[in-house]
Amino acid sequence: QAALILRIPVAHLHGGEITEGAYDDAIRHAITKMSNLHFTAAEPYRQRVIQMGEAPATVYNVGAVGLDHLLRNAPMPPDALAASLGFALHEPYFLVTYHPVTLAEEDPETSFRAMLAALDQFPDHQVILTYPNADNGGRAIIPILEDYARSRPDRVLAIPSLGFRRYLS
């Protein structure tokens, strides 16, 4: 908003995308309308930005720029990953990151508990649970997540964040 008022050019990455069930869309589209240059991740998103009234000459389909980061970072070997986690990791396992659906009718705790019940249907699988994001309902999920991991220490690891390389691994 300040950049718009002060006439500071803004370049927006990933405009035109849709996140169903989240208020991210309203924020993303507002940023699109305040931006001067638009770098979208795919042609349908480029078309959506143009449909929002932005000049086609200012909208570029450049792909998902974060994917380039994947090419520059090799995954960790499994033993190094396990050592960095302090968790004896073996296959099969699930890596689970749950973010609340911000516009859902159901409260996040109910949805999260249902997901944990589904994970219990796979007792031979280990589970790495990362904390939710900062969206509404995320904080309420953390104690549930920690209790779940605490009650299954040989099978479940709860961790606030893996960071990029461990998540990739």
Please report, for each region that a protein language model flagged, where it lies by residue.
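Hydrophobic/aromatic beta-strand patches that form the interior of the parallel beta-sheet core
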Residues: 11, 39, 60, 128, ...
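A nucleotide-sugar donor-handling region in carbohydrate enzymes
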Residues: 35-110
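Donor-nucleotide binding loops and adjacent catalytic segments primarily
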Residues: 76-169
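Short secondary-structure transition/capping segments
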Residues: 22-26, 72-73, 140-141
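Cofactor-binding loop segments of dinucleotide-utilizing enzymes, especially the Rossmann-like FAD-
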Residues: 15, 43, 64, 132-134, ...
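Short acidic loop-to-helix transition motifs that present clustered carboxylates
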Residues: 18-20, 45, 66, 162-166
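Active-site and donor-binding regions of nucleotide-sugar-utilizing enzymes
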Residues: 1-56
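Alpha-helical scaffold segments in soluble metabolic enzymes
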Residues: 30-33, 48, 69, 114-118, ...
